[in-house]
């Protein structure tokens, strides 16, 4: 890869990036073929490859020549099912072409990242920064937007995005042909879209990451100007010299027939967080500045990505401060005003600070609705057996129920009023017992007698909830007064999948109307 990077630099790739000759270098496909054989480009099994599968670079070059002719009737993926994005068997040649195309496209992107100003954007690249973001930015923001970058992207949008990065048109022809070949499937033909990250290949992961990079780059100019300090609503300050720096960022507008002054910030404070395809933008500022930022983000994004031709565009709507759905679960929020009085030395100055305190609450009713939707209980909250899991082993059933409870408790560990979670625990434990009883065609009492009463205590033990806390001995007394966000929250379970399906269905219904 270093050799290809040097090749791009010698040709002044930052200004005129001619990458098409790289497609006909055998070293490129040697690297891509090794990636394909090692399974590093995909998480799918490679059982369809035979040991005597001879790879010919001449065949690959012929495929590149066919792509150059822009004949969309050519079947590039000869061994694929009607839907290439499904679990199908791809030939080694088509995989090598995709790997080679990915390696070529990564060259200008890596060179651009060295010169781009995005390197100055110091962000927290961890999912665990979401909860500090909610605690610090939610209470002090005037406008909170919940944006959704769809996984379904039109091929032409990706091609036009890469056109800003790659100067030579022949390099874009293979990309356009491959994208439209993937689009021409029975499921994607009506919508004319391409589902990017559903298949865990290096090619589609690169396309998705690059598309997200371009979406976030339009925020860089605003984020660079915005202040990252915590916003507090202050009372008017007296004229004192040691507040000169703070007063520089404040403008005084006096009203007629009023002795009060309105204190406004010059620049709005913009905070951004993303998890998967969903992102949250929090803006702090005046009503006019917030309105300008909203129009800037929406209109500039549409013009930048030509989103008027995309049926499933980037969806953005105002998010209430009383709820949040990131990352996947549902969280209710209660804002409590907090008054703080500060005093300087010798009692020369006293200032009253008014701020909001972020108090997350466990939403019991929505969680019960999700449990009822997934057939763990009925609509009234009465536990029922999970019939779809009766064909699993006893250990798998216990582990699945235990994982759901552990993820729920860890996610809401930083919330107040966690007593309602024990009702959820009771529903899950009894549903687990009924599932095992239904599997063995017996009763709950017989299952407990055969498997042992300690079996459910190990899976749903009360002590393990505080095993990771440094003060486990005093956790029971301090659990209601302290918030601790656990670090193993990004786990996949049926509740998160069900919640995401509900949200995606609501968004699709909005566009279909």
Curated annotation (Swiss-Prot):
One GO CC term on file: chloroplast
A GO biological process of this protein is: tRNA processing
Keywords, in A-Z order: Chloroplast, mRNA processing, Plastid, RNA-binding, tRNA processing
What's the chief localization of this chain? plastid
Q: Where in the cell is it found?
A: Plastid, Chloroplast
The family database entries (Pfam families) matched by this protein are listed as:
Intron_maturas2, MatK_N
GO MF terms listed in the record are:
RNA binding
Q: Which InterPro entries match?
A: Domain_X (IPR024937), Maturase_MatK (IPR002866), Maturase_MatK_N (IPR024942)
> Does the record carry tRNA processing as a key word?
yes
What this protein is reported to do is described as: Usually encoded in the trnK tRNA gene intron. Probably assists in splicing its own and other chloroplast group II introns.
| HAMAP family cross-referenced by the UniProt entry | MatK
Q: Which family does it belong to?
A: Belongs to the intron maturase 2 family. MatK subfamily.
Q: Which PANTHER family match?
A: MATURASE K
Please give the name of this protein.
Answer: Maturase K
Query: What organism is the protein native to?
Result: Pinus parviflora
